């Protein structure tokens, strides 16, 4: 037995040598391809069945104005509220939002002392200023890597909201609020849940029409649908909505949830999975109960752990959704990533969302806003300073950068495809992303950019798509690109080239000829190496509103009045308040009288947890949770990976 480790070491060295040889051959072959490619005319674009126009070559794509100084269209925070009040009271007609430009003004984006600022002046309400980035070099990098807009959206009844209309692409995540009721009283809250004085809740007929209408629009791209609220699990139609969305073909059915029902009702997750729920977007503000105290439940972290366990046991993937407020929980960026690494088999994604001062926080004072403002550049620097993971100027990309791979996949699917590939085509100021390779067994990790030159691979994908050499040769060139951009000399121990190829094949829906394993949660759990995505999604508020971002929104809100950009719905001119008020079911008092009150947990006390629940299998590095004090089976301490996160 003593010789086996030596045999394994020799085998691993042999694999590494073979990988180095392969990558060198691929690099040489790629340059041959590029040299020949210059002398052969590009293949022509085709119009797929799912689109209203031919696929775009990279040079045909349009771009918003980027860089600085630049001028854009924005809103006056005070004018907007005045106009919204008049529309809600009947003093102004709703057509003003469609035909006019209420509250709009010009804004300048410029550099000041290494920061990027937005400045605007209203003739009536004066000067407004807010920070867009604390690092102008990082801001410049993210804008430089933007690959261009998607196909033009067709303006029709679902997208007829004046200057708030989405004008490019199809979106990635269709968001549907099932109810504005909630069982918490969070601050911040996009919709000011439980405080508006009325209940807005969709009927099943509403849900069917909204979901049916959404898949008739061209470009007809694959979309996820996310049921939201309020708390969507309070809707009596939650399971029906999930099942219907799955039935008619939505790529991925998700729920944005606080996790309370998944915690208190162990069978709730199983029923949701049976209905077709694939992903839970779980509100998660940090590690330990003290980092959730602003949510007004004293043991909320314990609640989250139980929800994650129940969701995992039911086969539902978990995305941690972290609203970051400067001076409140910005110190939790590192601990949240560490928690996700230690539980990478249960957590597939972290979505950090810098605070948007809207809903319950729309009237924030200037001093508090300045203190609590958090940007995407804050996030990139906090990830490095708190964990040692990633370099801001190397490892972060605009979310839209992956559009190069979506374009390639669209080409490989051919003209007969009924659906286009899901595409994240948002403005570069909207979102950023990075990714880690994490071993499920050892918890060893590495930035994906350490293993593969992602920036160069995206450029290769653009060249392959523009060249249009047919599906067979394009797949050959994709394989060459992956090989030439892979660096076997710096991969974490145990990671091999075959792992990378399988991961790429799954993430692109079988672009290399394999099975679409990304649709199967069980398939992901069988992998030894997992990709943990870390994203920053910064939703706008009235202080930093930019209509160029609204036009390219990838998260359309599907409502009884059509599909509206996420930011135009939740902030902007205030479409949420208008839609909900015009389509409300009843006043809150009338609803309570007829249907009774749903519980609201908001008194800063413990939420009683089920006593007969199975032991938790999550690993937690903190003593600030009930399980650590009661001897429950969660593990505490370091992850023993040498990652440096526990110093």
Regions found by a protein language model. Name each.
Residues 77-80, 123-124, 181, 188, ...:
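Short, cysteine/histidine-rich loop/knuckle motifs that typically chelate Zn2+
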Residues 2-8, 13-24, 31-51, 313-524:
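Radical SAM enzyme [4Fe-4S]-AdoMet core and its adjacent flexible, acidic
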Residues 83-88, 129-134, 191-201, 570-580, ...:
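Iron-sulfur (Fe-S) cluster-binding segments and ferredoxin-like electron-carrier domains
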Residues 122, 127-129, 133, 143-270:
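Conserved alpha-helical substructure of the radical SAM core
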Residues 45-175:
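N-terminal [4Fe-4S]-dependent radical SAM core
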Residues 627-647:
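Histidine-centered metal-binding segments
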Residues 501-629:
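C-terminal target-recognition/interaction regions appended to catalytic cores
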Residues 208-226, 235-354:
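Radical SAM/AdoMet-radical enzyme domain recognition
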